[in-house]
């Protein structure tokens, strides 16, 4: 296709046979600017001005066309780069999702076996997770994002608190009630912070006390729930066919059934909230976690209650439908509140994950944050609101 400059050049020439085309020189004659005394006009007129204007016009048009072609090529190059980046991002997300699913299944199966085993197996596994999670918590407290505006507790205090947190589930299994022990431990840690060298800070005390409560005391309620509620779930059908070598029907207690339903409710909340947010997510839930949406949260609530009702019908616990709905709502609330709490800590710390222990998932806290408050809510609900523990 001819360019605009070529069209202008072709139309500027006369092809009529009545006269021949004569090319005028582009160099101005020497006499073209000669003037007589008193005259304001030159003796000879030339078409140089008209020709110069035409040349400038054609040059500008040609340059504009070349620039336009260059811009088009540049835009195509940018689009090509963006397309490659989008493909790489999709492949990366698909790889991360695949890794999360593989490690999620690899972790979920052993955890299910640990919950079924109960007793010391469950308690020791929980204590190990608590120890690692508490170490991650105190590392978050010492990170640049949080430590920038406060003075973190000394490292020896953080290590002592991690050990105390790990001992809480074990002491709960042995003594049942550890309120006095936890209070005594918190008092000793507070004294150690107050008599340290230098200038003690309130931020050190508050972050340490919260660490003991968040990483140690709250997870201990899972031991109370799984091992403390030893009343048999008499109406559970699966208990009748359970092998005698594994405990028989007596193995299926209220604590075991409630723990399985709570774990399943937390998993359902995370799964349905993720799928609902991807499909319907429009309205942000909170600035703490920008990726969470109200639509995904509502879908997570519906999914959690639905799974709780289905499992309660299958396991015949609790007997009341209203109790099943209330239990599902508490599991949902504990899951969301625990997730947002850890998101707030990580946001202040300026990190994406609490650690890198689990590929594709982050640290221990990133996986158990939804369970931290749920155990306490589930245990309190069964102890205070269900007659005969819902049997």
From Swiss-Prot:
For this protein, what reaction is catalysed?
a 1,2-diacyl-sn-glycero-3-phosphate + CTP + H(+) = a CDP-1,2-diacyl-sn-glycerol + diphosphate
**Phenotype of null mutants:** When associated with the disruption of CDS5, requires sucrose (Suc) treatment to grow. Pale yellow-green leaves with reduced chlorophyll levels but an increased chlorophyll a/b ratio. Reduced plastidial phosphatidylglycerol (PG) biosynthesis leading to abnormal thylakoid membrane development.
Supply the EC number(s): 2.7.7.41
General function of this protein: May be involved in the synthesis of minor phospholipids and in modulation of IP3-mediated signal transduction. Promotes the biosynthesis of plastidial phosphatidylglycerol (PG) which is required for structure and function of thylakoid membranes and, hence, for photoautotrophic growth.
Primary subcellular site in the record, as a coarse category:
plastid
What is the protein name for this chain?
Answer: Phosphatidate cytidylyltransferase 4, chloroplastic
Q: Which UniProt keywords apply?
A: Chloroplast, Lipid biosynthesis, Lipid metabolism, Magnesium, Membrane, Nucleotidyltransferase, Phospholipid biosynthesis, Phospholipid metabolism, Plastid, Transferase, Transit peptide, Transmembrane, Transmembrane helix
Activity regulation description? Highest activities is obtained at about 30 mM CTP and 2 mM phosphatidic acid (PA).
Pathway info: Phospholipid metabolism; CDP-diacylglycerol biosynthesis; CDP-diacylglycerol from sn-glycerol 3-phosphate: step 3/3
Topology of this chain in the membrane: Multi-pass membrane protein
Q: Which residues form a coiled coil?
A: none
Instruction: Spell out the molecular function terms from Gene Ontology.
Output: phosphatidate cytidylyltransferase activity
Ranges that cross the membrane: 102-122, 175-195, 202-222, 254-274, 298-318, 321-341
Give the stretch annotated as transit peptide in the record, renumbered to this chain.
1-61
Describe how the cofactor binds. Answer: Requires a divalent cation for activity. Displays highest activities with MgCl(2).
Q: Which domain of life is it from?
A: Eukaryota
Give the CC-aspect GO terms: chloroplast membrane; chloroplast thylakoid membrane; plastid
